[in-house]
Amino acid sequence: MKDRYGRTIKYLRLSVTDLCNCRCVYCMGENGVPRLPHSAILSFEEIEEIVRAAVSLGVTKVRLTGGEPLVRRGIDELVRRLRGIEGVEELAMTTNGARLAEYAEALKEAGLDRLNVSLDTLDPEKFRRITRIGELRDTLDGLDAARRAGFERIKLNTVLMGGVNDDEIAEIAALAKDGAFDVRFIELMPIGECTDWDRRRFLPAERVLEYLPKGERVPSGGVAELWRPAGFRGTVGLIRPLSQRFCADCD
């Protein structure tokens, strides 16, 4: 399957719910989003039908997102269904990790291959300010549970915010040192409430390199610019939706 720009499409992202158990300041308002009627949410059968159709057109990788996918009841059963579709070579999920300790083992057993977990700070107080209602301990416990369940090279997604977490860049990047995690720093996008934020909140992702040991550039099959700093087994990635247009390379 190709789009009108001639790009081969092999990657499908599916939002399985509009709901989330956090209220991250760069993502949604303090009161969340209006709840959609049940009839407006794709059923598991409909999601399975969509994935089968996509696979028939050449899609090989499927990512489950939200909202927060782990608030969708029976999410492990959905993973099991999708894992059973011939042609799905990789099944991944992006989560805030708040309920990951509860679901990690079941997700692995159901056939989930990869995890991306949002982690914008390692400071509990900052975490509460960023997520409004989240607890850092829940996400860290979720990461521990995911590793015990057998997930490898978990990706950590960190949104860069000047004056908020830029003083933690080196500390967060160091989580990639032993190879258990790969870290991705993402430029803050001026959407929603962020459009009114001070410009100093918006940092170019290249700033990250100033805090890392010198390293080597690593080939990337996606939109992230990947680096392996000296002494690191994992990678540190830069995702630049503002400072570098990457849409032409994205599928």
PLM feature segments, named:
Residues 1-13, 23-25, 56, 224-239, ...:
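N-terminal [4Fe-4S]-dependent radical SAM core
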Residues 4-44:
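Canonical Radical SAM [4Fe-4S] cluster-binding loop centered on the CxxxCxxC motif
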Residues 31-35, 122-124, 190-193:
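A short, flexible beta-alpha/helix-coil linker loop
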Residues 41-63, 71-176, 182:
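Radical SAM/AdoMet-radical enzyme domain recognition
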Residues 68:
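Conserved G/P- and acidic residue-centered "switch" motifs that form tight phosphate/ATP-binding loops
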Residues 160-164, 187-192, 242:
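Glycine-rich beta-alpha junction loops
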Residues 167-173, 189-198:
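Class I S-adenosyl-L-methionine
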Residues 192-251:
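Accessory C-terminal segments flanking Radical SAM cores
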